[in-house]
């Protein structure tokens, strides 16, 4: 991940840390609401996801921030849109709002590169101050790449390595936008 590695040179990095969950879905309530992963099933898909919490988004809303959650998947997928609403996000942007089926990966939602470009365009339209959260999809099983990138990223020892390289590339394009 050459681009992500390059960002670490300009970041506060903790080398001795642990993940707050086993799956990517566990990161969302940890980051947004400070909720640790304490259950076998993800908090977002549990009956507890509608509990009252006062997390980062609600605090930013009180400070007159515009808040938006981005996820290139279908509404209802993993209850991301529901959790975004309960967490207090002003807006949710997913596959329906993106509205370009040619960039659909056939499984999770919109490929990272085009959805991150959409994300950048929307960010540029927001008035300040704002807070936006983006959940990327392409680095998830079954690890599909867009047809025009099939030969661009080399295989690695694990199938996920190609799509992680693609996500790294997509993030670089986002930062260049």
Language-model features, listed with the residues they occupy:
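Solvent-exposed soluble domains appended to multi-pass membrane proteins
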Residues: 1-177
């Amino acid at each position: 991940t050459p681009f992500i590695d390059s960002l670490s040179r300009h970041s506060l990095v903790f080398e001795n840390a642990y993940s707050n969950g086993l799956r990517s879905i566990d990161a969302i309530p940890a980051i947004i609401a400070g909720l640790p992963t304490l259950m076998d099933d993800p908090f977002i898909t549990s009956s507890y996801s509608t509990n009252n919490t006062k997390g980062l988004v609600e605090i930013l809303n009180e400070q007159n921030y515009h808040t938006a959650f981005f996820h290139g998947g279908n509404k209802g997928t993993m209850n991301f849109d529901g959790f975004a609403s309960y967490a207090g996000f002003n807006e949710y942007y997913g596959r329906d709002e993106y509205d370009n089926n040619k960039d659909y990966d056939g499984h999770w939602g919109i490929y990272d590169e085009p959805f991150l470009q959409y994300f950048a365009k929307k960010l540029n339209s927001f008035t300040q101050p704002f807070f936006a959260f983006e959940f990327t999809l392409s680095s998830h099983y079954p690890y599909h790449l867009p047809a025009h990138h099939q030969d661009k990223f080399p295989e690695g020892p694990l199938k996920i390595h190609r799509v992680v390289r693609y996500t790294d590339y997509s993030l670089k394009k986002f930062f260049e936008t």
